[in-house]
């Protein structure tokens, strides 16, 4: 039995509150689903795309890059090494499946892309509420025929996905290097646009670009608060207009552990050793190195652990601005948008070639109000690719203007 997957005490969940509220109203029926995120080397994208087409799901693809540390020996046999950052182009696949099929789909993708080998990619799932025209489903016959291995021994639980939305050009690579130095994970860097904080800064807004660099880190849940505090200091997110952070829970996943590229000095790589200990210890609890109680407390007032929500909207470019502005008008604390390409199955028709995914951080007390407004003005009942996702976000940080 996986020790880290055993249920703990129940905590307040804004997404469950939204589900109960919308079910009682009876206008829209939210679907309890798992969103699977697969971050894959672009050379392997065709394999994953082919599998998802056969599976019959609608996936949304975003481009990004993974950052690793590369170590090379100095020329002319000089002592020491040359250390630099290496960027690898990746494709990010996001799609939803019924929760009961999550593990089987993850096992199959690990098989197809050989994600059990470090350096090939990361996959994880998050339980959330989805509003869409059709309830997500998968081709069960195809899934049964895939006959994948059971990777329960290496799948990790009690993880967190922490998203850093940064306003300064080049700050994404700087933060990625800090994450690599801490040995957290392989950072994923993507690009988007956002103007929430910029619109509130008056004349100083001309110095802040609407273009954002977004750093995604998948890490053990027990270290997430301490790591967030350290990285806030590194990126100086306690200054106005520098960006915002939010954290979301991960139900299960297999993070890439190949943080450093270089000559192998021992019989096993550090990635293989970490994977073996994770398997023996049935989780990542043994990795805990940081004690939150002894971290600097001066930013505690701005780190909000009071149950926020991430609301993700996927829609056509012509409609997304109206939907996003509706969220910001009622009190959302941050928004960032990126272009995605929908990947639909063979029987899907009338699919737009490009769409926009906008992720918005919303305080728990207004989540239901925001969802009501989005459902009122959205085209979910008409467009099969439009989505609204409501996901718990137990902690967020944004600089508050006085």
What name fits each language-model region?
Residues 2-402:
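Positively charged, small/polar-rich N-terminal and surface patches that mediate targeting and assembly
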């Amino acid at each position: 039995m996986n020790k880290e997957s055993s249920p703990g005490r129940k905590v307040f969940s804004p997404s469950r509150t939204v589900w109960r509220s919308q079910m009682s109203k009876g206008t829209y029926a939210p679907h309890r689903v798992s969103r699977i995120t697969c971050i894959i080397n672009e050379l392997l994208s065709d394999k994953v795309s082919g599998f998802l087409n056969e599976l019959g799901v609608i996936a949304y693809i975003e481009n990004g890059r993974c950052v690793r540390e590369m170590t090379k020996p100095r020329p002319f046999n000089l002592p020491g090494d040359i250390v630099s950052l290496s960027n690898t182009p990746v494709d990010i696949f996001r799609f939803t499946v019924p929760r009961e099929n999550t593990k089987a789909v993850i096992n199959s993708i690990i098989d197809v892309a050989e994600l059990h080998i470090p350096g090939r990619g990361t996959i994880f799932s998050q339980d959330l509420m989805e509003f869409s025209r059709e309830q997500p489903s998968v081709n069960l016959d195809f899934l049964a025929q895939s006959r994948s291995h059971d990777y329960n021994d290496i799948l990790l639980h009690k993880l967190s996905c922490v998203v850093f939305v940064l306003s300064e050009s080049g700050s994404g690579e700087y933060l990625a290097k800090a994450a690599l130095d801490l040995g957290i994970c392989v950072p994923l860097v993507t690009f988007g646009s956002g103007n929430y904080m910029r619109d509130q800064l008056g004349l100083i807004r001309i110095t802040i670009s609407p273009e954002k660099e977004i750093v995604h880190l998948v890490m053990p849940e027990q270290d997430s608060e301490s790591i967030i505090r350290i990285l806030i200091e590194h990126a100086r997110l306690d200054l106005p207009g520098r960006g915002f952070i939010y954290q979301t829970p991960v139900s299960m996943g297999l993070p890439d552990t190949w943080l450093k590229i270089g000559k192998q000095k021992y019989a096993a790589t550090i990635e293989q050793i970490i994977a073996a200990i994770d398997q023996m210890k049935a989780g990542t609890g043994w990795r805990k190195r940081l004690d939150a109680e002894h971290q600097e407390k001066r930013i505690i007032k701005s780190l909000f652990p009071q149950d926020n929500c991430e609301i993700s909207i996927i829609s056509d470019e012509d409609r997304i601005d109206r939907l996003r502005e509706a969220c910001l008008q009622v009190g959302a604390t941050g928004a960032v948008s990126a272009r995605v390409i929908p990947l639909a199955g063979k029987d899907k028709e009338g699919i737009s070639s490009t769409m926009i995914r906008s992720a918005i951080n919303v305080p728990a007390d207004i989540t239901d109000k925001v969802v009501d407004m989005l459902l009122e003005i959205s085209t979910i009942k008409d467009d099969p690719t439009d989505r609204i996702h409501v996901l718990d976000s137990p902690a967020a940080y944004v600089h508050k203007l006085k």
